[in-house]
Design a protein with these regions (language model features):
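Core-facing hydrophobic residues within beta-strands of well-ordered domains
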Residues: 29, 54-56, 181-182, 190
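Catalytic histidine-centered segment of alpha/beta-hydrolase-like enzymes
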Residues: 187-203
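Conserved serine/cysteine hydrolase catalytic core
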Residues: 119-177, 183-186
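Conserved catalytic-core motifs of eukaryotic protein kinase domains, centered on the activation segment
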Residues: 2-9, 69-72, 168-169
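Gly/Ala-rich beta-loop-alpha elbow adjacent to hydrolase catalytic centers
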Residues: 36, 40, 44
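Flexible "cap/lid" loop of the alpha/beta hydrolase fold
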Residues: 45-49, 54-90
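Active-site loop/oxyanion-hole signature of alpha/beta-hydrolase fold enzymes
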Residues: 1-35, 204
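Conserved alpha/beta-hydrolase catalytic His-Asp/Glu region
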Residues: 88-142
Length: 231
């Protein structure tokens, strides 16, 4: 994240167009699947609500939309990435790398790999690659609930059993917005960063969804599902 050029401003319209540009540049063909995690899931909702007729399906991964009642009881904090910070050495910067929200992970080598590829050399030391303007807290000000309700293609939700952001109550509420034919898949033992701490379970969940969609263009599934974990 951060290897591409930075923009003067960011919004969901721009991000949706850039998702479409990536699909075209990668030559993914007609009706590709779009899969987005966390904030990327919100932008998946946006592109699927605006251009759903061009997609084969959209998979939202642990992107929380809570009911007004749950939000009142447990309001979500929207962290900002903060200002640019310079570290004297690569190792000093890497030691500060954290998942957001913080969580334990049984696969620290994956976290370290991401951290190593999230840094770049600057004139005065080492800095994170991301643009703080792109990652500011105001990016959560989009009407994502409306995007989810307006999704114009097959959609599914994957969430972690132990996620700090998407509870089963949250998943149930999102299911009500998506409709009864949208699969909801819970990955056992996974937290918010599903693909890091339970990568095999996450892949199993994705395969289950995408294989079902590809086998039967009209099959959207129904009801909550639970991914199995290979031993």
């Amino acid at each position: 994240m951060g290897d591409s050029a930075w923009r003067a401003h960011y919004n969901s319209e721009l991000r949706a167009e850039e998702i479409r540009a990536v699909i075209a540049a990668a030559e993914l063909g007609e009706r590709p699947f779009v899969i987005g995690h966390s904030f990327g899931g919100f932008m998946t909702m946006k592109v699927a609500s605006q251009y759903g007729d061009t997609l084969g399906g959209a998979v939202i991964v642990d992107s929380p939309i809570r009911s007004p009642e749950e939000e009142a009881r447990h309001p979500l904090t929207r962290p900002s990435m903060g200002n640019r910070r310079v570290y004297e050495t690569f190792d000093a910067a890497l030691a500060r790398f954290r998942l957001m929200p913080e969580q334990p992970c049984d696969n620290p080598f994956i976290v370290e790999f991401i951290g190593r590829h999230s840094l770049r050399r600057a004139e005065d030391g080492w800095v994170w690659k991301f643009d703080s303007e792109a990652m500011g807290s105001r990016r959560f000000g989009e009407p994502v609930r409306e995007y989810l309700q307006a999704v114009g293609c097959r959609a599914a939700l994957i969430f972690g059993e132990k996620s700090a952001l998407v509870s089963r109550e949250t998943a149930s509420y999102m299911s009500s917005l998506m409709g009864p034919r949208a699969p909801v898949v819970e990955v056992p033992e996974a937290r918010h960063h599903v693909m890091l701490d339970q990568p095999l379970g996450f892949v199993a969940a994705l395969r289950m969804l995408l294989d079902s969609w590809m086998r039967n263009e009209s099959a959207e599934g129904s009801g909550p599902l639970r991914a199995t974990r290979d031993n």
